[in-house]
A protein has these predicted regions:
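Conserved, well-structured core segments that form or line functional sites
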Residues: 1-205
Length: 205
């Protein structure tokens, strides 16, 4: 079956649509000449200056300015003094929004990703955003990479996603906790957490 690389137009759409449509797609990153990556199974949407959980809530800064640029570029930031978070910018230029990649089912370069993470179980490789970035070897040095390029990309192998669930986002406290903007594939072992009130995405659109 033909594998199709996602174009910039895929990301230049409403963030909730992009987040849901990214589930089941395959993220590929070239790390030291080796192909690493896997199937995306968990994502969160962060949308504009009206979203209190979004980095752009208080306006444009040197840290978040890439969110105001064109869709389809990496926004990577360092948090909690230990973790890098991997996001893909969405929507039109000038409107700050992004999708946080929270969980990935490993496919390519599994041994290297285990080594990067220092783990032995495949389900411990990328079941969380910080774990995922570390497994891939992605840091703030990769901030600004074009996701439609050759170093990092997302492809569609036309496989249907399993049941999709949505919930409130993780680790944001009360900031936007009413928004069910976390999307994940039901019962997938590479999802970070499932102990949250869930809903069906059909009720959102």
């Amino acid at each position: 079956m033909r594998i199709v690389k996602l174009k910039r137009s895929f990301y230049n759409r409403p963030t909730l649509e992009v987040a849901v449509d990214l589930l089941g797609k395959i993220l590929i990153y070239i790390f030291n000449g080796e192909k690493l990556g896997g199937r995306l199974v968990e994502l969160e949407a962060y949308i504009g200056q009206d979203d209190p959980a979004c980095h752009a809530f208080k306006g444009k800064t040197s840290r978040n300015e890439i969110m105001y640029g064109k869709a389809g570029f990496l926004y990577v930031y360092f948090t909690y003094g230990n973790h890098h978070m991997l996001n893909i910018v969405t929507e039109r230029a000038g409107f700050p929004a992004a999708v946080l990649i929270r969980g990935m089912e490993p496919i390519y370069g599994i041994e290297t990703m285990m080594k990067n993470r220092g783990v032995e179980k495949i389900t411990d490789i990328s079941n969380g955003p910080g774990k995922l970035a570390k497994a891939l070897g992605i840091t703030t040095k990769q901030k600004g990479l074009d996701v439609t390029g050759n170093i990092i990309t997302v492809v569609d192998d036309k496989k249907q996603s399993d049941d999709i669930c949505c919930s409130s986002r993780i680790g944001i406290g009360d900031n936007g906790a009413d928004k069910l903007w976390r999307f994940y594939i039901k019962d997938n072992p590479h999802v970070s957490k499932t102990s949250r009130k869930v809903n069906n995405t059909a009720k959102l659109f």
